[in-house]
Amino acid sequence: MTEIVTALIEQAACQIILDADGINALAAHKDVLQRAARPVVLTPHAGEFARLSGVKNASPEFLAQFAQENRCVLLYKGHRTLIAAPDGALYRNHSGNPGMAKGGCGDVLAGMLTALCGQGIPAVQAACAAAWLHGRAGDLAANTLSEYGMTPSDMLGLLPRVLKRYNSREW
């Protein structure tokens, strides 16, 4: 799998987004990030980032430094998701809640990020937007179903309500 991930990063003409095992496959070869045609988006939680960087409990400053040194966009998942850009900028998402710390929530986020990048939105902006929209859907799910009762599928189902509020078109 490592060879496939490395080859994709080096050769792909489209935006690459790596989550979960894609990040784990990259851990021993993170130098490939510097050879990518465009900044790769990585979406690790703390454990995945520790395997990738060798640093547990990374500070926001370290995340920004990592993104800058490795020419990547880092969407560091947590209760307050952080987005670090290749230029060293750091963004903090303030939507979301602890009920989102469930298996599958990161998959929903990765799918949202992929959809935004697929529409041509630049990676950093797409990462910030996906994190915020994901968190708002999580907040709506928690308000409706409770943090304990909500599931990633509930969040996905509530996403149209979140988007409708910010739709600029009058129908």
Task: Identify the meaning behind each predicted range.
Residues M1-S95, K164-W171:
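Glycine-rich phosphate/dinucleotide-binding loop and adjoining beta-alpha-beta core of small-molecule
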Residues L18, A84, R92-S95, G99-G103, ...:
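Short glycine- and Lys/Arg-enriched binding-loop motifs that mark or flank ligand-binding interfaces
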Residues G47-S53, H94-M100, A110, T114, ...:
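Short beta-alpha connecting loops at secondary-structure transitions
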Residues R51, K102-L133:
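Short, small-residue alpha-helix embedded
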Residues N57-P60, G99, G103, G149:
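Short, conserved loop/turn and helix-capping segments at secondary-structure boundaries
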Residues S59-Q68, A123-A137, P152-P160:
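Short, well-structured alpha-helical segments that form the helix of a local strand-helix-strand
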Residues A137-W171:
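Charged C-terminal helix
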